[in-house]
Amino acid sequence: MNKKMQLYNRLHKLNTAQIITLGFAGVIILGGLLLWLPFCTAPGYHTSFTDAMFTATTSICVTGLVTVVTATHWTLAGKIIILVLIQIGGVGLISLGSIIFISLRKKISLRNRRVIQESYNMDRMGGMVRLVKKVLICMFGAEGIGAVCYAVRFIPQFGLAKGLGYSVFTAVSAFCNAGIDLLGEDSLAQYVADPIVNFTSVGLIIMSGLGFVVWWDIWDKIKRVIRGKLPVGRIFKNLRLHSKIVLMMTLILVVGGTVLIFLFDHGNPESIGTYSPGTKWMASLFQSVTTRTAGFFTVSQERFSNATYMLCLILMLIGGSPMGTAGGIKTTTVAVLLLSLKSNLQGKRDVEVHHRRIRDSYIRSAIVVTGMVLTVLILMSMLLCAAMPEAPIEDVVYEITSAVATVGLSRGLTPCLNTAGKWIVILTMYLGRIGPLTLGTAVTVRAQKMPADSHLAEEDIMIG
């Protein structure tokens, strides 16, 4: 009994960062063990423990790198388990726990509300349950609409049952930014010229990448316009600073990435050079969007030019926005770093944008998250190079960048990974999924609790 009480007390003392870290690890292990069971593997195939753990990790971390072909290797039971893991990874463990409490009609304690607050990196505790409910409504609603759009193409092609199953799986995978599909080894390549599949995928990826807070902010302003309380032309001006930064960064990255990919590869016959002008632009748009943590592709990654390769590395690292399903260091992190750089070059003490000042704690959080991701990227790239000396360095860097940013794109290296390489990528995906969220939350909360007048003596050092 004493041991049970000690265990309970230890679990009760866990902070948000520890809950997220242990929670993801626990679900990954459980999912891996389930996928390792014989009934999950299709006849004629064998699933090693490493491949089962790799698949569970890539699913719960909504990455999309796969060592086996999902469409043929797994049975229906295995595919359902993968889909559930993707949905859990997209919803988030904290939201999932809240769902269980709500469904059981149990009251969420003050401590658990604090966990929800810190996991979403929010300043106030009010409305936490409403927040989780809104997340679920938005997520399942968007996935449902996406499934209907995909069904328009998949049902005529594959039949009612299989087409409907493919539609639901692809919609969930696209919205959760997992990039796992049931269409075979070539992802969505057969639909490179199909507007329905392309724009449905792009729409789901961008919507989830914006983050739920931005959705609600825009919806709130639209309601005010409908009620006649706000002119249409002043919607953007009345948005929260967070929403303004996210929308501006997303627009710049999507449009800028599309234009640059088109310019770099429009004459490349290996990638998009042989397509019609409209298909070239559509393929460029898809590549620009999917590199920001989606993982689907309509053109094989190794076919793009070196310039597009470098651009994709940058887009993968940036990723999506907070409070969404995307990975990466996040658009707001990059914006804060760039604004901080601008302020320092101009000799300003404060970081300002849209007539607002950004807190120092958020600047520190942005630095920590970026530093952590770059550190993991460098270390894991070296380890994978050591484990697979025969692999080209550009493929290794692309693989690790994709893993740490939970993107899921590969230049063909994933199926060729040896056992050591697979475990390196598993660890990278795990660190990439829990790292930015955990460290960003921990640093911000800790900074807010520190006394403002607590300082040590200063001493000069040389920089640059």
Predicted regions and their residues:
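Membrane-proximal intracellular helices of multi-pass ion channels
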Residues: 1-464
